[in-house]
Amino acid sequence: MSRIGLKPIEVPQGVEITVDEKNIVTVKGPNGQLSEKIHRDITVETEANVINVVRPTENKKHKSLHGLSRTLVANMVEGVTKGYEKKLELVGVGYRATMQGKKLVLSLGFSHPVEIDQPEGLTIEVPSQTQVTVKGIDKQQVGNFAAKIREYRKPEPYKGKGVRYAGEVVRRKEGKTGK
């Protein structure tokens, strides 16, 4: 059984946390500000430099919400201090990525280039033509945008061509063997 919800969250210096009456937790830090609505049954207690997330009962629903709420708050604290990044690699002949102003332009073997607008709160870097880095303070937003980019051309199992996360292992298949 997981006991993630019972762990206290360390608050680094320079991070300010507020909880209002509607159970909305706001975290301000050097990189920005994030807020998240926590379920009404879960209470968030802030002390000097420690946050405790408390559940009212031991039933299954409250235990699940407890771990979720604690992780959401911990991710917000880490996001406003360190930030998150997701790296993507483009594998395939002619697969390229470039930045044109605030747009990410991908050449992925389609008859047209794929243009994706940079969302608010995220920064996109293209260190080389085959690498894309998505950075931001909101872990969920970074992951969703990286998944959106990957969705345009997932790695295929025969040659491994496509957009993949850095370090992702693509399971390869053997092609058909002729007679």
UniProtKB/Swiss-Prot annotation:
Reading the lineage from the top rank, the first entry is Bacteria
Supply the Gene3D superfamilies for this chain.
Ribosomal protein L6, alpha-beta domain
Annotated Gene Ontology cellular component terms: cytosolic large ribosomal subunit
Fetch the InterPro entries from UniProt. Answer: Ribosomal_uL6-like, Ribosomal_uL6-like_a/b-dom_sf, Ribosomal_uL6_a/b-dom, Ribosomal_uL6_bac-type, Ribosomal_uL6_CS
Under the heading PROSITE patterns, the entry gives:
RIBOSOMAL_L6_1
- Key words, A-Z: Ribonucleoprotein, Ribosomal protein, RNA-binding, rRNA-binding
Q: Which GO terms describe its biological process?
A: cytoplasmic translation
Q: Which GO terms describe its molecular function?
A: rRNA binding; structural constituent of ribosome
User: Its biological function?
Assistant: This protein binds to the 23S rRNA, and is important in its secondary structure. It is located near the subunit interface in the base of the L7/L12 stalk, and near the tRNA binding site of the peptidyltransferase center.
**Matches recorded under NCBIfam families:** L6_bact (TIGR03654)
Q: Which family does it belong to?
A: Belongs to the universal ribosomal protein uL6 family.
The record's annotation in HAMAP family points to: Ribosomal_uL6_B
Q: How does it assemble?
A: Part of the 50S ribosomal subunit.
Q: What is this protein called?
A: Large ribosomal subunit protein uL6
Which species?
Alkaliphilus metalliredigens (strain QYMF)
